[in-house]
A protein has these predicted regions:
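Short gly/ser-rich loop at a beta-strand->alpha-helix junction or flexible surface loop bordering the NTP-binding
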Residues: 78-138
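Short coil turns linking two alpha-helices in DNA-binding domains
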Residues: 24, 34-42
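Short amphipathic alpha-helical interface segments
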Residues: 5-18
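A short, conserved structural fragment
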Residues: 47-57
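A broadly conserved amphipathic alpha-helix scaffold signal in soluble, globular proteins
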Residues: 9-12, 26, 44
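Short acidic, hydrophobic short linear motifs in intrinsically disordered regions
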Residues: 17-30
Length: 138
């Protein structure tokens, strides 16, 4: 993940878990050890689309979903893949083999949320902790 993406992730996570929407650029810069200009840069696009509202001394995550959707549209998942394999089985069968510690992502996740896939898909992505990767390899 790029630095600006870690800022977006943090803003979304804090909003979701702690219901905190008001932040300062200096506070985030200190938290991550980034420069204030890096944090400021991370807020440019979300501000343009109305996800973030900047005030003189702070900013507010105004629209959680806009930031989430924007991040999803620009995120490069391929960089975060730490294990890749091929299985000739059907998609539903592969999804059934994912260990209980795994969290579905992308199309697999959407097909569970909406009870139907948003489109045909041929890859299964999921998140899993590093210590559980061996379970996924089996």
């Amino acid at each position: 993940m790029r630095k600006i993406e870690t800022v977006w992730h943090h803003l979304l996570q804090i909003a979701l878990t702690e219901k905190k929407f008001k932040h300062t650029q200096k506070g985030l810069a200190d938290f991550f050890g980034y420069s204030v200009s890096t944090v400021n840069h991370s807020l440019v696009a979300p501000t343009k689309i109305g996800a973030i509202r900047k005030e003189s001394k702070f900013f507010v995550l105004e629209n959680f979903q806009k930031l989430l959707y924007y991040w999803a549209s620009v995120r490069n998942l391929e960089k975060d893949v730490i294990y890749k394999t091929h299985c000739p089985a059907a998609i539903k069968e592969i999804e059934g083999l994912i260990p209980s510690e795994g969290i579905y992502a992308c199309y697999s996740s959407a097909s569970r949320i909406f009870d139907e896939p948003p489109a045909d898909y041929s890859k299964v992505y999921f998140y899993i902790e590093e210590q559980d990767i061996e379970k996924a390899k089996q």
